[in-house]
């Protein structure tokens, strides 16, 4: 049940964030299939970048706590050199790099917005760990994307009680 609540919180944030157009969950290798929704347009395209995509990675239990680790991908498309209309900043390669850097910068800001919103939310039963690791990625998909993967650890109360087992 806890993963469902975290997934819903991420969807709510994605839907309310003005710079996010699509959201999905599941296996990152299957981004763009039925696990991704377009939040902004009636287009039949499943992904309209920028995209936020969440993948539950692991869970561990300790005395009184369940830790759920979720990888949250913040990604956007990087324009191809051909669509940039020629040479930018003196060199096509530099133009490409400028665009990639802008995408990385924008996606890092969106990731920070999500982290801020998820940290110490008094309305939720879980808390986000104060340390979130962010790892950049570039050109990781066929559709030329760049962005960040935030590894978030959610701490959820767990009593280890047999009374919670359905009968």
Regions found by a protein language model. Give the residues of each.
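Small/polar-rich, solvent-exposed N-terminal microdomains that initiate assembly or binding
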Residues: 1-65, 165-167
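Short, well-structured alpha-helical interface segments that form or flank functional binding sites
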Residues: 5, 67, 109, 113
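Hydrophobic beta-strand residues in large extracellular and virion-surface proteins
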Residues: 10, 54, 72, 114, ...
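Acidic-leaning, charged glycine-interspersed low-complexity segments
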Residues: 17, 21-23, 43-47, 98-157
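Intrinsically disordered, low-complexity segments enriched in small/polar residues
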Residues: 22-24, 30, 88, 93, ...
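Oligomerization/assembly interface segments of phage tail-like spikes and tubes
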Residues: 64-81, 144-158
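A solvent-exposed, charged loop/short amphipathic helix patch at secondary-structure junctions
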Residues: 80-103
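Short, charged, solvent-exposed linker or helix-capping segments at domain edges/interfaces
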Residues: 82-86, 161-167
